[in-house]
């Protein structure tokens, strides 16, 4: 058997399978984003509640982030990931039933439960580096996230193609997600994750989370990932509703989301290389600039191309910030601290997404698309300030 340390990067079969699982996870997420707000708008007691099914998925992820981290420490990566996929199968079936029954609150409850899958799959990016030698760490994170290209193509097209399968719009899309999760469950069963190290008697369990979280690198990592994801989610979740309010048909909204998700994940094929060559902070800085460019384009008008270009730039900006944040986080913890540090970051990400997914529906239906974009400037300013602070800290340490 060949030594894994000497194998070429692309020869690691398990990494490819994990990237496939990531792609199927993003297929699920893109379908949820594309249809949950519209289904919610048709069922909700009030228009401002339209994105509650999207919010439920994110809140479920936030609530599950801590338990999932502990479950992974106890059961290992694969078994915990498989449990998450079983939850995905069950919750997608309940979503289809809720849509058929025109039951808004059952739909919200089903997406809340589906958040357990969301929290599990969010850890795929951390599991990737464990499947390859240390010198491939940044590339492994990027390539796992690059699997999302599958979701970029499959998700919008699946949502559009299955919209009218049944009398109830989009019930067929939810049922298709059952099959997507089953395929992911099969791929997950073939991945050989390294066994977690056996606990040693008297061995250190690492620093408390409060100490880990006080590090500048941890703070900025969370700022990049959480606020980058928050702004992306704020604008993405509102896009189908905003386009419908601007009289664009659903197939155009699906096209915009397809290009948005391509922007999110196609750069993953080279983001890791950019980080190794130019450094993590410059790449994150470019992510901030791309987000600002997105806002500028979005504010310039509401034609199809303006939505498409803005959401594409938003996707690329998210990619740079998210991968940079994830890479920074790996500098903030020791091996025995990984579950609590990763769980803390993902809790912050999900909590931010919960606020923005709910806020997107309320803001776009009451204040409009323009104010939604203007509100995105403040989080980006906070990320830029954090990056400048960490860069100053590192220059001081070198001096």
Task: Spell out what each predicted region is.
Residues 139-157, 348-356:
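Glycine-rich segments within core transmembrane alpha-helices of 12-TM secondary carriers
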Residues 23, 104-119, 306-320:
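Hydrophobic core of transmembrane alpha-helices in multi-pass small-molecule transporters
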Residues 36, 118-132, 320-333:
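Intracellular juxtamembrane helix-capping segments at the cytosolic ends
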Residues 64-77, 266-280, 364:
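Helix-to-loop junctions at the C-terminal end of transmembrane segments
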Residues 110-147:
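Cytoplasmic helix-loop-helix junction between adjacent transmembrane helices
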Residues 86-101, 290-302:
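C-terminal ends and interior cores of transmembrane alpha-helices
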Residues 1-12, 193-222:
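Juxtamembrane intracellular "pre-TM" segments in multi-pass secondary transporters
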Residues 160, 178-199, 386-391:
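C-terminal membrane-cytosol helix-exit motif in multi-pass small-molecule transporters
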